[in-house]
Amino acid sequence: MPSIEAVGAREILDSRGNPTVEVEVVLEDGTLGRAAVPSGASTGAFEAVELRDGEDRYGGKGVRKAVAAVIERIGPAIIELEATEQRLLDQTLIDLDGTPGKSALGANALLGVSLAVAKAAAAASGLPLFRYLGGPSAHLLPVPMLNILNGGAHADTNVDIQEFMIAPIGASSFSESLRWGAEVYHALKSVLKARGLGTGVGDEGGFAPSLPTNRDALDLIAEAVDKVGLRLGSDVALALDVASTEFYADGSYTFEGSTRTAEELSDYYAELVGAYPIVSIEDPLAEDDWSGWVALTERLGTKVQLVGDDLFVTNPERLARGIASKAANALLVKVNQIGTLTETLDAVNLAHRNGYRAMMSHRSGETEDTTIADLAVAVDCGQIKTGAPARSERVAKYNQLLRIEEELDDAARFAGAAAFPRHGQPA
């Protein structure tokens, strides 16, 4: 396998118009690998650190320091390493940074290099990325968790819950599930217009109307599902990303205009799960509310998927704590939360070995990079959330999954309802 010959980086823009890092790695045979790094809006306190410039340009969000770190510090340290030695490469990056949160060189610098090398190695091997990372058994297409209605930090409205998603679990293939999702998305726009509600979209492409309550959002989606002739529950299930850390302070939650304890908020979720076909709730409680998470998981963990995003931040150490204390039953996977591909794969493997599901995820600040689509198939996630079926930085990932399904042909298998605890064992 060719070794790394050159490493470059540049500042590009993400989908919110903020700078991010793009890295290019060239191998000695001329093979190129390119990767762009995403960025979140609602970020966990325990995520690896993005390196930003803090200067006047771009409101302090420039990434020239991270770009310089790639070119001046990381590049010279990895030249001549074999591109297939991913674990060695990533450990070299971690050691070079030398801080627990990757704050010296920046997780955005490290991740760009880590992913670009993997993509170069796949290309040099003559393999698609999903096959290079996942081996010959990688064939499971994930259920798309389509964020069609936005609130919280992703939209400037009075809706507390950050994401209302649909999961087309009854489809026979990924392509059919994506079609169903797109049809419901367009139907929802019609429903909103008919009621005189706004059809502007949030960061991830979902509509962002002002609504009296969070239940109103679920009812509107249910109407849209019915409008296209699909059955709520068996064809299309519902999912939430509450992002509750955003409204948590001093041990309580400010939700729908009132202050609630973890137990009271758990009562609310129990009511929702009883009233609607909800298969997944992400970050129902805050990243520091471990006791609340344990109690909620004991209460609802056999009925609905409880996903740790801010709780785990794709970090094997935090995930291990969750497994030991029986907090949550699924891991949200965001490559930029931890900063290297190897650590991401380790987190997913730890989750799967302990009976936790894993959901691959984008960030609200995205690019046209499609790495997470391949990664979802490579690690048998069975679930992916990468926004609405709108905005090209979201659709790029879904389109890549269509290509992968086509390439797999008869070997492709769609995760479907079995991906969620409410509908049986994992696929």
Curated annotation (Swiss-Prot):
Main location: cytoplasm
Positions of Mg(2+) binding: 241, 282, 309
Cleaved signal peptide residues: none
Residues binding (2R)-2-phosphoglycerate: 162, 334, 363-364, 385
EC code(s) of this entry: 4.2.1.11
Active site: 204, 334
Localization of this protein: Cytoplasm; Secreted; Cell surface
InterPro entries assigned to the protein according to its UniProt record, in alphabetical order: Enolase (IPR000941), Enolase-like_C_sf (IPR036849), Enolase-like_N (IPR029017), Enolase_C (IPR020810), Enolase_CS (IPR020809), Enolase_N (IPR020811)
Pathway, per record: Carbohydrate degradation; glycolysis; pyruvate from D-glyceraldehyde 3-phosphate: step 4/5
HAMAP family: Enolase
Annotated family: Belongs to the enolase family.
Protein name: Enolase
Organism: Frankia alni (strain DSM 45986 / CECT 9034 / ACN14a)
